Every structure is written in C-alpha cells, then in structure tokens.
Design a protein with these regions (language model features):
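Non-catalytic, solvent-exposed segments at the cell envelope interface
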Residues: 1-335
Length: 335
C-alpha cells in the first residue's frame, strides 16, 4: 500500500519452527471474500468485502482478527513495510539474487522507466527499486495475482538467503536503517533478541516451504454485489472460499495437527455460490441468500473448539508491502 491506510498489496504470514527447523511462508489471496469486524459500519454495513480492505478499514487489529477468524490460527506480531520503505530493506542487505524469466524482464523493461533495466537469467541481482517492481507485476502471465504472490515469496526467500552471509553487525545495521520506516508491534529490544537468536541458531539456514491460502480447489471466482466504502452497492470480483477446509489445511501445515472436523453435513460455500446463492460466511452450514442480498453472518465458525495447543502464537503477518515479519517460534519450540 502507499500509506498506512491503504489496501494491503501483500499479505504474507511467516512461521518459524525451531523444532522442525522449517520456515513456512503463506500468502493469503487479497481478493478473498470475507467478513471483517470493521469499527465504522457506515463504510460497509454488511462488513463483507475483499480481505485486503480489512487493513484499510480497520488497520492491523481488524486485519489480524480477520485472518485469525477465517483460518483459526493465532498471530502475535506484525511488521508492515510500505512501498517507500521496501527498497531500503532490500538495499540494506545488499540486494537480492533470484531467477528472472525472459518474459518477466521484457514486461518490466517495457512498462517501467523509473528503474535500471533488468536482465533475465538464473541468478540476477536486483536492487531495492527493481525488487519492488518485480513483486508488484501481475499482468505478465496467465497466473495473475497467484503469480504475483509467488514472486513476493521469491523475494522474501532471496532476502533470507542474503541474510545467511551477513554478520550480526551487518544485520543490526540493516535493522537500524529499516526500523524507522516500518510499523510493528515488536519492541526494538525484542527485534535485537530475535536477530541474536537467528544468527546464533542459524535460522536463515532452515528449509523454506511456501503455501497459498486458500489452496487450489478451495475457492472459486465470484461476482458479488456489496457495499464498497460509502458508495451504494457495487459489483465485486472476488473469491468465494470454503474456509473450514482451508483452515484445516493451514493448521495441519503449520501445527502438524488440527482441531477442525469437517462433518458429513458440511456444505461448502463454493457449492452455495454455484447454486446461485451468496453464502453466509459461516461457511460450514447449509445456508445462503440469493445473489445480491445482504450477508449477516460473522466469520466462518466451523467445528473448532480451541486452537491447537502445540504451536500457538507461532506466526507473523505482513501488510501492506511484500515483507515478512521477523520470525517468531511455535511455543513448544521456544527456549
């Protein structure tokens, strides 16, 4: 986003598990149709819109609450980097090296004049300005926004690799440059402690896994009429999601277990939409309203009792640019 009140351009959760020595990057599709408990109901009386609007209308608290409600996970911290600050983070670590496809280089060089030309290749080094442009392109191929989320995770992975060869002093210097330009609920002392642990325990050498939520098959393209800001009902191109199934999948990936049971009576929100209904965002119940009607249900509440106890408070989320929060650990892996 261009400011602290813009829509989130990237929503990426970073999970670091010291027990399994694994980092997981999860991109949330920003056009996901969801309920959000925004404080100003006049902005959207139905409180249903695209996921990235939760940041614009309610800031970090509403964004985090929405993700927690939809996917039944816990998020403790956030780090937000805007478009002006993002290049500084890249440059502070000496740039990033990654594979650039010929069609990506051609598209960037043809559509962007404010940066140095980018070459294609298996190991191309980008500076901060070039990396920002790379993370934002989405009309370059048929993958669209899915391709963009993949490029955002590629940049984060490349950043972690850049940090592998840095000294603790270099990492501290990078933080001194970046911290004045980010928004976070981490204290500076906490960040220094995390950096010290990351360096001593070689977190940057952990295996890195990537995911997109919802995954393929758990969402469908939809056109829904809803309130957009203070404007009367407007058509919204979005994704209708089977949240209980998606939440169960994410819990298993992050925690290694789940407390979500998908019963035989489960009716997918996707099926409801395909039947000409706009599903209430409870998702796990056989309910819906005719297209273009109001949505009154809060975020989906599938058969969840409590958060999995093994690995709660494990994850970070980012908004609005493409940087992950500093890694936190699952409780069971804490020192």
């Amino acid at each position: 986003a261009e400011s602290n009140t813009g829509r989130s351009d990237a929503l990426i959760l970073l999970s670091l598990n010291k027990r399994t020595k694994k980092i997981t990057l999860v991109s949330f599709l920003r056009d996901s149709y969801t309920y959000m408990n925004i404080p100003d109901a006049a902005r959207n009386p139905e409180r249903c819109c695209k996921l990235n609007h939760s940041y614009r209308w309610g800031g970090y608290p509403v964004l985090i609450e929405t993700l927690e409600n939809d996917y039944k996970i816990e998020i403790d911290h956030y780090i937000s980097v805007d478009f002006k600050s993002f290049p500084k983070l890249i440059d502070a670590l000496g740039g990033v090296t990654l594979k650039i496809e010929p069609y990506e280089a051609e598209y960037i060089n043809r559509t962007t004049t404010q940066i140095d030309k980018i070459q294609s290749g298996d190991a191309v080094k980008l500076n901060g300005a070039q990396a920002l442009v790379y993370t934002r392109i989405r009309h370059v191929d048929a993958a669209g926004d899915l391709g963009r989320t993949a490029r955002q995770r590629t940049i984060i992975t490349a950043l972690i690799k850049s940090a592998q060869g840095a000294s603790l002093g270099q990492l501290n210097n990078a933080m001194d440059i970046v911290l004045p330009n980010v928004h976070t609920n981490y204290g500076k002392g906490e960040i220094i402690s995390l950096l010290t642990q990351a360096f001593a325990q070689k977190w940057m050498n952990y295996d890195i896994a990537q995911m997109v939520m919802p995954s393929e098959g758990n969402y469908v393209a939809a056109r829904i009429y809803t309130y957009y800001g203070r404007v009367a009902r407007m058509q919204l191109d979005t994704w209708v999601i089977d949240y209980p199934v998606a939440a169960r999948e994410l819990q298993l990936a992050l925690y290694g277990k789940t407390n979500i049971n998908i019963g035989s009576d489960h009716v997918s929100a996707i099926d409801l939409y395909n039947q000409g209904l706009v599903p209430t965002l409870g998702g796990s119940t056989a309910s819906g309203t005719r297209a273009q009607s109001s949505h009154t249900a809060p975020a989906q509440t599938s058969q969840v009792e409590t958060q999995p106890t093994e690995a709660t408070a494990a994850h970070e989320t980012t908004s609005p640019a493409a940087e992950p929060a500093t890694a936190a650990e699952p409780e069971e892996a804490n020192d």
